[in-house]
Every structure is written in C-alpha cells, then in structure tokens.
C-alpha cells in the first residue's frame, strides 16, 4: 500500500484545512496517509501578536521523514508570489536526501493559498514544484478531470498546477466547498499515481 505524506505550513489555518482535504482524497484512493507540518520560524511573541494559529494537531516533520513515503504533497501559503520561508527552509535541508537520490521517483504535488485572486497562486505552486523536480520526483497537478476549476459562477481557487484557496486580505474567508473538493481530488489523483508506481 502506498504511503503518502501531506507536508504543510499554515500560519492562519487555511492551508491546514486544505491539507486535511488533500489527505481525505489520498485515503479515499486507498493510501496510508500522514499529515505533518514544518517548524515555525517566527518568534512565539511575534506569532501570537500576529494571531498565528499555533494550536495545530499535526506533528512536526523531520527531513528524514521524506524518504519514508511514496508520495509527498506540499502545501504552504504564498509569501509575495513564492512559498513561505518556513517551507523553503525545511526543503533547503533536504540536500543530503537529494545527494543520495533518496527522493527519486517519488510522486509529488503542491497546493497553496493567497489573499487575493491574483496574489501569486501559480508562481507559488511553481516555487514548490521546482524543488520537487530537483529532488527527482514525478509531479502531479490538479488535472481538468476536476471540473470545479472551470467554473465562472463563483470566486474560486484551483489551477492545473495544484489546488488553491483564497483567504481574503483579513483571512476571514475559509476554503470553499469547491476548493476543498479540488484538494480532495488532487490528493486522490496523487495517491492513485503512487499506487500505480509503487504498489
């Protein structure tokens, strides 16, 4: 049975919610799924003053965890059109795994959130996907079998490069039903691909 890691960073909880939906989809495909987060780098007093969601249930991942999975699905909110520094810092520490080829052939994917419709969703996904390709991973996006990303009837995230959500400038908007459906679809598709490749 394929093992899937949903690895995320979430400052305000939106990506945490998306990560849970991604995991639901992967489990639906029959994979064993773990959800882990990367360490917070912001000092605790600053994080509290900024109303960061610090009470997240997922355990903190270690770099060595990455080698133990057949698929790794990475999610983080955007920071000025790229992945958050917390996720970048974590992935930057994977050089030893990269040097050994320990991630070659694993299945990867990306998901993200932005405050606005044009706040850098695709560039943030690309910043994650670039890392996955350098690691030697097979990247799976959110294909157009998910019709929800074609809708014009509502403001919604979703791109062929990965599932996305919009939060609003004040963070009040939570992932919509359509966005969560996209996250589940991507999780299921990635898990199905991992099962085909790794059993």
Curated annotation (Swiss-Prot):
Output the Gene Ontology cellular-component terms.
membrane
One GO MF term: NADPH dehydrogenase (quinone) activity
Report the enzyme's class at the first EC level: oxidoreductase
Cofactor binding note of this UniProt entry: Binds 1 FMN per monomer.
Gene3D superfamilies named among the record's database cross-references: 3.40.50.360
Recorded catalytic activity of this chain's protein: a quinone + NADH + H(+) = a quinol + NAD(+); a quinone + NADPH + H(+) = a quinol + NADP(+)
Q: Which InterPro entries has this protein been placed in? A: Flavodoxin/NO_synth, Flavoprotein-like_sf, Flavoprotein_WrbA-like, FMN_Rdtase-like_dom, NQO
Q: Where is the signal peptide?
A: none
> Cystine bridges: which residues?
none
Enzyme Commission number:
1.6.5.2
The record's comment on protein family reads: Belongs to the WrbA family.
What is the protein name given in its UniProt record? NAD(P)H dehydrogenase (quinone)
Q: Which organism is it from?
A: Rhodopseudomonas palustris (strain HaA2)
């Amino acid at each position: 049975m394929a093992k899937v890691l949903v690895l995320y960073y979430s400052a305000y909880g939106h990506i945490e919610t998306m990560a849970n939906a991604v995991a639901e989809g992967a489990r639906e495909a029959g994979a064993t799924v773990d959800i882990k987060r990367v360490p917070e780098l912001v000092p605790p007093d600053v994080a509290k003053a900024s109303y960061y969601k610090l009470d997240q249930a997922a355990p903190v991942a270690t770099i060595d965890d990455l080698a133990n999975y057949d698929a790794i699905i990475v999610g983080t909110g955007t920071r000025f059109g790229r992945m958050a520094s917390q996720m970048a810092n974590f992935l930057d520490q994977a050089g030893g795994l990269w040097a050994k080829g320990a991630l070659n052939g694993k299945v990867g994917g990306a998901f993200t959130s932005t405050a606005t419709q044009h706040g850098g969703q695709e560039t943030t996904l690309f910043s994650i996907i670039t890392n996955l390709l350098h690691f030697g991973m097979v990247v799976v996006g959110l294909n157009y079998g998910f019709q929800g990303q074609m809708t014009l009837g509502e403001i919604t995230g979703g791109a062929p490069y990965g599932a996305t959500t919009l939060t609003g400038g004040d963070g009040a908007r939570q992932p919509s039903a359509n966005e969560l459906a996209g996250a589940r679809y991507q999780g299921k598709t990635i898990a199905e691909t991992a099962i085909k490749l790794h059993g």
